[in-house]
Amino acid sequence: MAPALAVTRDLTAVGSPENAPAKGRASVYSEVQSSRINNTLPLPSVLKGAFKIVEGPASSAAGNPDEIAKLFPGLYGQPSVAVVPDQDAPSSAPKLKIGVVLSGGQAPGGHNVISGLFDYLQERAKGSTFYGFKGGPAGIMKCKYVELNAEYIQPYRNQGGFDMICSGRDKIETPDQFKQAEETAKKLDLDGLVVIGGDDSNTNACLLAENFRSKNLKTRVIGCPKTIDGDLKCKEVPTSFGFDTACKIYSEMIGNVMIDARSTGKYYHFVRLMGRAASHITLECALQTHPNITIIGEEVSAQKQTLKNVTDYMVDVICKRAELGYNYGVILIPEGLIDFIPEVQELIAELNEILANEVVDENGLWKKKLTEQSLKLFDLLPEAIQEQLMLERDPHGNVQVAKIETEKMLIQMVETELEKRKQAGAYKGQFMGQSHFFGYEGRCGLPTNFDATYCYALGYGAGVLLNSGKTGLISSVGNLAAPVEEWTVGGTALTALMDVERRHGKFKPVIKKAMVELEGAPFKKFASLREEWALKNRYISPGPIQFTGPGSDSLSHTLLLELGAQ
């Protein structure tokens, strides 16, 4: 057996230019990383031979089609397309000049979208030029880019992270910013641009496509669906990349914590999971690991639950488990829980208003300006959370909701309620809470076989769409429960995913976030099992992500259930 220290490989020693690391990339890789770099990915059969683009019927919008039509006069109504085999189609295309940008937070697989797009250009449009815009959309506006070639891309194949060209959260939305993007497109003579991002980024990609078309620029814009949160999806886009990997990383850690809880027999682990809006990650991790309690934000909202309702539900389960001799357990909480509780939102709105105009006095006279319901809720909160609400403001003077550590708040609220029940003789157990936040750990892991392959197909498909003269579409790969060879490839009209929101008196286009559907198969399966999980320890420890052998090609429960394949 090789010694433990021999698990790294210096790619500079390989001698092949394809394996030379890009500037700024660590040159030392683990054995697993090295094996992933050199792993060849399969493509859907339709992308292996000659093919053509077939257009579907005219599209509409997810909501308010009349308003979307006004906002996108050049793109609205365009059809979605499918790539289909065609032996008579040419197998090669004229060379192109293409740019790519990573936008928003990291998600495992982003590098493979770029690799797939690059390989399409190498194989089908020989002699093409490929630019990577550095640091997100700001790189487009400032014309900061790097020319991507085989040597530069190779060390990033099948690797996590966005560090090949890095990402950013800037938006191209003002007239000046659109003008900067136009100047960059003209300067580099771009035939196309691929925007890899979430719902906001793809909304901006559509606005950019509309702008370029209105100015008669030849630059076409295609989006790719990225977000670990899993809230960018529809019938044609079954999942966003990164969700599969992130959920498996979190589920491994949750499984480890479960075994720890069972081993010590004395801790309740409160685990907050990333997902600012939708609770998809929390639901998927619950299906993978079977925790005792899982809070789904969309259900809390639908049932108009209060913070006390949520706390009482947890305490009820903890008391029942204590009667069975279990003084331990695992509780999953979505990051965006606070946003789903109407009374908390009302309290925050009132605090923002009061603190914008008042100095908070130590005697608490300012509290008289709160409504009765908000005052009652404020007094219910632990002191540390009260201080956080009062003191930590963003640059606009508002409460920083994202910084509220919900898991710690709930531990304190559960402790308080359990103490009351103990005094009343209704609880005889022992309670010790441990808090965790699993978030950043899942954003840049080595992508699973599914995410690596899915992203590669998305990138290759984006190249096909650009070469076919399409713009304002999002690269779409479907039939994902089937073997890779049978996956379908196409493009979905971005305007078909859009609705409008009223902001500052104007309609703004937005791609609607896909929330957890309480009538959907994933939630229904969870709901049918949660009572059993609450009192019986049905813990599953999935272990680390596998790249070969059992479990290596498994798909998320959410995807399989939504596709009707489980």
Swiss-Prot record:
<feature type="binding site">
    <location>
        <position position="105"/>
    </location>
    <ligand>
        <name>diphosphate</name>
    </ligand>
</feature>
<feature type="binding site">
    <location>
        <begin position="266"/>
        <end position="267"/>
    </location>
    <ligand>
        <name>substrate</name>
    </ligand>
</feature>
<feature type="binding site">
    <location>
        <position position="199"/>
    </location>
    <ligand>
        <name>Mg(2+)</name>
    </ligand>
</feature>
<feature type="binding site" description="in other chain">
    <location>
        <begin position="227"/>
        <end position="229"/>
    </location>
    <ligand>
        <name>substrate</name>
    </ligand>
</feature>
<keyword id="KW-0597">Phosphoprotein</keyword>
<protein>
    <recommendedName>
        <fullName>Pyrophosphate--fructose 6-phosphate 1-phosphotransferase subunit beta 1</fullName>
        <ecNumber>2.7.1.90</ecNumber>
    </recommendedName>
</protein>
<dbReference type="GO" id="GO:0006002">
    <property type="term" value="P:fructose 6-phosphate metabolic process"/>
</dbReference>
<comment type="similarity">
    <text>Belongs to the phosphofructokinase type A (PFKA) family. PPi-dependent PFK group II subfamily. Clade 'Long' sub-subfamily.</text>
</comment>
<dbReference type="InterPro" id="IPR022953">
    <property type="entry name" value="ATP_PFK"/>
</dbReference>
<dbReference type="GO" id="GO:0046872">
    <property type="term" value="F:metal ion binding"/>
</dbReference>
<dbReference type="GO" id="GO:0003872">
    <property type="term" value="F:6-phosphofructokinase activity"/>
</dbReference>
<dbReference type="GO" id="GO:0005829">
    <property type="term" value="C:cytosol"/>
</dbReference>
<feature type="site" description="Important for catalytic activity; stabilizes the transition state when the phosphoryl donor is PPi">
    <location>
        <position position="226"/>
    </location>
</feature>
<feature type="active site" description="Proton acceptor">
    <location>
        <position position="229"/>
    </location>
</feature>
<keyword id="KW-0460">Magnesium</keyword>
<dbReference type="InterPro" id="IPR035966">
    <property type="entry name" value="PKF_sf"/>
</dbReference>
<keyword id="KW-0418">Kinase</keyword>
<feature type="binding site" description="in other chain">
    <location>
        <begin position="440"/>
        <end position="443"/>
    </location>
    <ligand>
        <name>substrate</name>
    </ligand>
</feature>
<feature type="site" description="Important for catalytic activity and substrate specificity; stabilizes the transition state when the phosphoryl donor is PPi; prevents ATP from binding by mimicking the alpha-phosphate group of ATP">
    <location>
        <position position="200"/>
    </location>
</feature>
<feature type="binding site" description="in other chain">
    <location>
        <position position="335"/>
    </location>
    <ligand>
        <name>substrate</name>
    </ligand>
</feature>
<dbReference type="InterPro" id="IPR011183">
    <property type="entry name" value="PfpB_PPi_PFK"/>
</dbReference>
<feature type="binding site" description="in other chain">
    <location>
        <begin position="274"/>
        <end position="276"/>
    </location>
    <ligand>
        <name>substrate</name>
    </ligand>
</feature>
<feature type="modified residue" description="Phosphoserine">
    <location>
        <position position="16"/>
    </location>
</feature>
<comment type="function">
    <text>Catalytic subunit of pyrophosphate--fructose 6-phosphate 1-phosphotransferase. Catalyzes the phosphorylation of D-fructose 6-phosphate, the first committing step of glycolysis. Uses inorganic phosphate (PPi) as phosphoryl donor instead of ATP like common ATP-dependent phosphofructokinases (ATP-PFKs), which renders the reaction reversible, and can thus function both in glycolysis and gluconeogenesis.</text>
</comment>
<dbReference type="GO" id="GO:0047334">
    <property type="term" value="F:diphosphate-fructose-6-phosphate 1-phosphotransferase activity"/>
</dbReference>
<dbReference type="Pfam" id="PF00365">
    <property type="entry name" value="PFK"/>
</dbReference>
<keyword id="KW-0963">Cytoplasm</keyword>
<dbReference type="GO" id="GO:0009505">
    <property type="term" value="C:plant-type cell wall"/>
</dbReference>
<keyword id="KW-0479">Metal-binding</keyword>
<dbReference type="GO" id="GO:0005524">
    <property type="term" value="F:ATP binding"/>
</dbReference>
<keyword id="KW-0324">Glycolysis</keyword>
<comment type="pathway">
    <text>Carbohydrate degradation; glycolysis; D-glyceraldehyde 3-phosphate and glycerone phosphate from D-glucose: step 3/4.</text>
</comment>
<keyword id="KW-0021">Allosteric enzyme</keyword>
<comment type="subunit">
    <text>Tetramer of two alpha (regulatory) and two beta (catalytic) chains.</text>
</comment>
<keyword id="KW-0808">Transferase</keyword>
<dbReference type="InterPro" id="IPR000023">
    <property type="entry name" value="Phosphofructokinase_dom"/>
</dbReference>
<dbReference type="GO" id="GO:0015979">
    <property type="term" value="P:photosynthesis"/>
</dbReference>
